Amino acid sequence: MIIKQYLLKISLCVLLLGCDSAKKEISKNENSKTEVDYFADNGFGNAVALVQHPSGVYHNGITYVAYQGPLEDPYVASYNHETKEWKGPFKAGISEMGKDPSRKKKIDNHGKPALLIDNAGYVHIAFGGHGGMRHHGENTLGNYSYGKNLHAVSKKPYDISEWETRDNVSLFGTYSQFIKMDNGDIYLFYRHGAHRSDWVYQKSMDNGVTFSEPVSFLKHKRRTNIEAEDSWYPWVSRGNADDIIVAFDYHICRDNVNAQDARGHIPERHNVYYMVFDTKNGQWKNVKNERLQMPLTKEMADEKTLVRSIPNDWTFQGITDVDPDGNPHVAVLVGPDINARRSGPKRLQHFRWDGQQWLKSNTANLPRGDGDLEVTSATEVSIYLENKTSNDVGEISRWDSFNGGESFQKSKVFLQRENSGFVISSLIDNPHPDARIIVAEKEEGTDFRKMYLLGDNGPIKRSKKEAQVLND
């Protein structure tokens, strides 16, 4: 009798274990079939931004995306629009930031990756820099902050699974911005150090194997009338033909202790400017086609490149695009000085060149939030915007103008999340309609972010098992 009871217990245990195993297998299979609308959950901090760009490139049927992941290292993923297949994310390099637990600022956020594909099919990223440090050597074009600017390249064309880091760009860079011209020339723009540094570019004519020495195009220098230095924040993009276009605002980089403002050094920016770099002849010019003496100083910028003087309110993050005739549109975030170390809430202001003068658009109906600008014709202009609604709903939307940018109306919502917010990338380079922009969802209580690839049909979905990278 005792033996029978013992055997019965064993049989029940085996049965229960088998059931439990079967349940786990069913759950595993269901998880692999369940789709979510994010492609990865390991975005970290401000995982993407407008300034480090492009964060994504569409090429030969595939969209490639890059973002900041755990420990501020760069990650790259891809989506095949024909097969609906995701690959990655793969860690593409190791940042010198994000590893020091003793730092007061745990997440630096300045070294997010910019991505480019060269004419041979190799994928490039620039990442990891916030101006470099003194032990890296002498910075002849500015001062120092943190991190180390790095350049990594895929080991095989169009294959993002393996990477190598090349020592061929300045390690003092930050805010990396990549541009590839039609002839294959690659330009890497960045600030050569911390706030009190020149903005420069390096050029490659051999698919990023080598780069020229840094060339300054925006000059930092000491002010003589106040205790501060001139500093800049440009946003660089492709124009028409051989042109590179630049929108930028001015940072008055006050001394920590100065006689003019008791707040000391604060993120105070003013004005918005525009200029063009003709890469065919190497000349810089303003919107009136007047040549500019480079590197550009504050005095010359005010005289020749000013879009709008904004002396009292604070500005942030200029963006620009041109219509098919080369007429530029410029937008910049503007918020009031509230006598604090930050400005009040900022809203996009939009300006357009009519061939004779800069005109200010009516954007009073735009919600507060950051975004990118797309000009598709002389009359059609779109703004891709992140914002929070009055009901605390994070939203990514598009606002369209059909009157050349005079006014904008909300036309499409790509994504909404309750009790969340988003950080947004610039528009993907040469975007597929289904994959125009990358966003990271900000949730309370965690520094990790769900990453979304958004297009005209909303977010591109992925299996839950593949998207939950942090559980691997």
Swiss-Prot record:
Residues 1-21 form the signal peptide. It holds the Pfam family BNR_4. Transmembrane segments: none annotated. Keywords: Lyase, Metal-binding, Signal, Zinc. Ulvan lyase involved in ulvan degradation. Ulvan is the main polysaccharide component of the Ulvales (green seaweed) cell wall. It is composed of disaccharide building blocks comprising 3-sulfated rhamnose (Rha3S) linked to D-glucuronic acid (GlcA), L-iduronic acid (IduA), or D-xylose (Xyl). Ulvan lyase catalyzes the endolytic cleavage of the glycosidic bond between Rha3S and the uronic acids GlcA or IduA, producing oligosaccharides that have unsaturated 4-deoxy-L-threo-hex-4-enopyranosiduronic acid (deltaUA) at the non-reducing end. Belongs to the polysaccharide lyase 25 family. This is Ulvan lyase.
